[in-house]
């Protein structure tokens, strides 16, 4: 299979976008471990239609104008990984889930650690929103782009990462909830 790529700037650093003829195959970080996402030889082609669509959608997302991506995706992984990545796509903008919740969603309630491993191998960062998955108790845990980037993405989506898995409303609603808790 032929893969093409381009590199774009973003508020969370430079991102490498990789596409096949089927769709977007990867969004990786500038300092990403090359063993994390393996696709084969890449050819630079910033004019490829999938890459242009992904770039436009990412710019709109970072500009606060896009909440749901529509660029076609081409996941490469095991069946289990693909089931986890498909579950990521169901997490709405501004909400979070735990690894355990994803495990239950895919019908493997005892597979939280395996879900975490698959989440860590997610080839299409941001668009398949692995940043919306938090550790037990709502902790920010490992993220290929770094915890600062994960925090930035959650904040962009109106989530206060310090609230963990609770308060899944807007930042205003979260602040009101925090105020009510402090008053009682």
Give the residues covered by each predicted segment.
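Basic nucleic-acid-binding alpha-helical/helix-turn surface characteristic of O6-alkylguanine DNA
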Residues: 1-109, 156-184
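Short glycine/serine-rich loop segments
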Residues: 110-152
